[in-house]
């Protein structure tokens, strides 16, 4: 069993009690909620005449179902209007901080919390959303929970969990030019398999991880769940502290130095013990694209669709289904695959650095005539910053639609959907069957830069052909 890792330290600090059956009762330092998984939880509190235990440790925003084309109230979508109105009323009743549309701080919950300084090293963070692992980029232990656990956290600020094992993923060397965090994490999931992380927390480390910006680290941790891990984290360092300093909710003045000193003490010790260690050479990673129906089914842009015996054993069970659904054959090149829709956004890649990279590719270029392309900033703050830098004009001039913040086509709960058997180049995190709104829609996951390149050519392309000119 792991010893003296950051995960062990944070877990032990937040363990309230040992429970019958071997699980632990864990205190949650920050509870993030949104409009989709919270209504039933609040309803359960009302049924039992309970109040939120620590409303000051709960923060809400709207993201999943909000329209990105027209956010004037009331929304055209009655369900969206109802869900957001319900969250607003629940937050007022229970005195919970709520960042609504137009507040300047609304957006995807996993984008908003870090940019406000709510996410901090050493925290336990829970949210009714799979990609809560994003916050582990700051050295927190963050995990998605179901609606019943959302209820438990609202009522008690604790949940029952079995302690996870810890696997260190050591990324040697550095990423090459034109290779991004999205490429690296897709490669990791491909190498380990989509079930390898079950029962584990992933600690990402090594020179390649140290080189990444905080926003790139969030991309890595965001997709931990796609490799089966309940959470993923990175030890905090000077980049972490620099990013957090002077954020709205970060410690201020003399409390800042005290906080940094404590955060540094949480780092995995030199003599810590991991349950497993996986090593890879980051310098060998190519621009990576999914070809199948799990994030583990990915290849480099210049590679061919693998045959069954070339696929990781953990992924073989759906490989044949993926061939049929995606209309790919073993040995077929992924490069030059025609694209219909290009989407840049999501909690994985909807931050300002993602938009900057994509805009650099798009500048002085035009979206192909057959392509529908749109960019959805991850938050109102990201949108504001992008407009100040003129990024919105670059996207619009190239032929992209500029949208308002929200989850959008990542999960297609609003009107942003694929139609029929359209193929999308998407910077989101999941390529499951029907994920982007159409039962027959096909999703190719890739970095924002690769999406931008695909939008120009109308097909899967190597972004290095654009940035190395």
Curated annotation (Swiss-Prot):
GO biological process: L-leucine biosynthetic process
Matching PROSITE patterns: ACONITASE_1 (PS00450), ACONITASE_2 (PS01244)
Cofactor note: Binds 1 [4Fe-4S] cluster per subunit.
CDD domains named among the record's database cross-references: IPMI
Entry's family note: Belongs to the aconitase/IPM isomerase family. LeuC type 1 subfamily.
Subunit structure: Heterodimer of LeuC and LeuD.
Name the record gives this protein: 3-isopropylmalate dehydratase large subunit
Naturally occurring in which organism (per UniProt): Prochlorococcus marinus subsp. pastoris (strain CCMP1986 / NIES-2087 / MED4)
């Amino acid at each position: 069993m792991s010893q003296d890792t950051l995960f062990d330290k944070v877990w032990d600090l937040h363990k309230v009690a040992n429970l019958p059956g071997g699980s632990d009762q864990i205190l949650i330092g920050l509870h993030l909620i949104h409009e989709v998984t919270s209504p039933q939880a609040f309803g359960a509190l009302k049924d039992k005449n309970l109040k939120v235990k620590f409303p000051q440790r709960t923060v809400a925003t709207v993201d999943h179902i909000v329209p990105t084309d027209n956010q004037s109230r009331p929304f055209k979508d009655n369900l969206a209007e109802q869900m957001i109105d319900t969250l607003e009323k629940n937050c007022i009743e229970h005195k919970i901080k709520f960042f609504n549309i137009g507040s300047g701080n609304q957006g995807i919950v996993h984008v908003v919390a870090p940019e406000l300084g709510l996410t901090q090293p050493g925290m336990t963070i829970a949210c009714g959303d799979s990609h809560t692992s994003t916050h582990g980029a700051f050295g927190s232990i963050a995990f998605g929970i179901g609606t019943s656990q959302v209820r438990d956290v609202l009522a008690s600020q604790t949940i029952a969990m079995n302690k996870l094992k810890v696997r260190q993923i050591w990324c040697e060397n550095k990423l090459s030019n034109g290779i991004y965090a999205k490429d690296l994490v897709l490669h990791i999931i491909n190498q380990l398999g989509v079930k390898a992380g079950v029962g584990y927390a992933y600690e990402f480390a090594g020179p390649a991880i140290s080189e990444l910006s905080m926003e790139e680290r969030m991309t890595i941790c965001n997709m931990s769940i796609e490799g089966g891990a309940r959470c993923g984290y990175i030890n905090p360092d000077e980049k972490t502290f620099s990013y957090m300093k002077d954020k709205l909710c970060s410690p201020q003045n003399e409390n800042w130095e005290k906080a940094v000193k404590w955060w540094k003490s949480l780092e995995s010790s030199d003599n810590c013990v991991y349950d497993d260690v996986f090593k890879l050479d980051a310098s060998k990673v190519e621009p990576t694209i999914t070809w199948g129906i799990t994030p583990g089914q990915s290849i480099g842009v210049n590679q061919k669709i693998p045959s069954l015996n070339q696929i990781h054993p953990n992924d073989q069970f759906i490989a044949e289904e993926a061939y049929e659904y995606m209309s790919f054959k073993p040995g077929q090149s992924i490069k030059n695959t025609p694209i219909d829709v290009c989407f840049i956004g999501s909690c994985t890649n909807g931050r300002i650095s993602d938009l900057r990279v994509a805009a650099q590719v798009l500048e002085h270029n035009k979206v192909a005539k057959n392509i529908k392309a749109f960019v959805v900033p991850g938050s109102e703050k990201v949108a504001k910053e992008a407009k100040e830098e003129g990024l919105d004009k670059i996207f619009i001039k190239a032929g992209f639609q500029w949208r308002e913040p929200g989850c959008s086509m990542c999960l297609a709960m609003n009107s942003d959907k694929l139609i029929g058997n359209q193929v999308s180049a998407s910077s989101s995190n999941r390529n499951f069957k029907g994920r982007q709104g159409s039962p027959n829609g096909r999703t190719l996951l890739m970095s924002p830069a690769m999406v931008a390149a695909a939008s120009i050519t109308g097909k899967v392309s190597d972004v290095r052909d654009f940035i190395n000119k």
